[in-house]
Design a protein with these regions (language model features):
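Short, Lys/Arg-enriched N-terminal segments with co-localized hydrophobic residues
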Residues: 1-21
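Hydrophobic ligand-binding cavity/cleft-lining segments
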Residues: 15-73, 84
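Short, surface-exposed coil-to-beta transition loops
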Residues: 23-25, 87-93, 118-123
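Solvent-exposed residues in well-ordered beta-strands and their adjoining turns
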Residues: 29-33, 74-76, 95-97, 112, ...
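Short amphipathic beta-strand and strand-loop transition segments with alternating hydrophobic
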Residues: 55-64, 95-96, 121-128
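Glycine-rich portal/gate segments that line the openings of hydrophobic small-molecule binding cavities
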Residues: 60-109
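A conserved amphipathic terminal alpha-helix motif
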Residues: 95-98, 149-178
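Beta-strand/loop substructures that line and gate deep hydrophobic ligand-binding cavities in soluble
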Residues: 104-158
C-alpha cells in the first residue's frame, strides 16, 4: 500500500488564540523515477484531476516544468461556514529548483486562502527512494484570526491530510495508466 502520512503539531499561543500554527510533515511515495514523478506533478491535466478528485467546486491550473499555480474553489467546512461563507478560494503556488543528475530536486509550496490571514509555507524534497520516488513536504500552516484561529486550525487539518492523500491516490492511478 502506498504511503501517505501527515503529521500535524499544533502550537497555539495562550492569548485569545491570535495565531494558530500547525507543523506540516507529509510524505508521498510514487512507483516511478524522479523524472517521471516530477513530470506528473507539473502536468496541468494531473493537477486538474487532483482538483476534481478533491471535490473542488472549480479550479484553474497553470503549470510548466518549474512552476505551477492552481486556484481552487472549495466548499467551506460546516463548522466554520458562519465565519467564512459557503466557499473558500485556495491559491497554491509551487516552484521547483533544477534537478540533480539522479532527478532529485527541491521546491517550495505556498498555499494561501484568499481573503484570510492563513498560509502554508512548505519545503518539498523529491528524491529517489521507496517504490521509486519519495516526495516529502515539511513546513508550517498559520492562521492569524483572533478568538477562532484554533477552531479554524482544527478544520484545516483534515483538509490538508485529504489533499496529500488524494495526490497519492491520483498519482498512483496516473502512473499505472502509463
Amino acid at each position: 500500500t502506498p504511503v501517505c502520512a501527515l503529521t500535524l503539531a499544533s502550537n497555539r499561543p495562550g492569548v485569545c488564540g491570535r495565531m494558530a500554527r500547525m507543523q506540516i510533515e507529509a510524505h508521498n511515495d510514487f512507483a516511478a523515477d524522479p523524472f517521471a514523478t516530477h513530470a506528473m506533478l507539473t502536468d496541468p491535466a494531473f493537477l486538474a484531476r487532483v482538483c476534481v478528485e478533491s471535490g473542488d467546486v472549480s479550479h484553474r491550473v497553470d503549470a510548466v516544468a518549474d512552476h505551477s499555480a492552481v486556484e481552487r474553489q472549495r466548499h467551506t467546512p460546516a463548522a466554520v461556514r458562519n465565519f467564512l461563507g459557503d466557499t473558500l478560494t485556495l491559491l497554491q503556488d509551487i516552484r521547483w529548483r533544477p534537478a540533480a543528475a539522479d532527478g532529485a530536486r527541491t521546491g517550495t509550496l505556498a498555499l494561501t486562502v484568499k481573503g484570510m490571514p492563513a498560509k502554508a509555507d512548505v519545503a518539498i524534497d523529491l528524491r529517489p527512494g521507496g517504490r521509486g520516488t519519495l516526495v516529502d513536504f515539511v513546513g508550517q500552516f498559520t492562521i492569524k484570526v483572533p478568538f477562532v484561529g484554533g477552531k479554524l486550525e482544527g478544520q484545516a487539518a483534515p483538509a490538508l491530510l485529504e489533499g496529500f492523500g488524494v495526490q497519492q491516490r491520483v498519482g498512483d492511478e496516473w502512473l499505472a495508466a502509463g
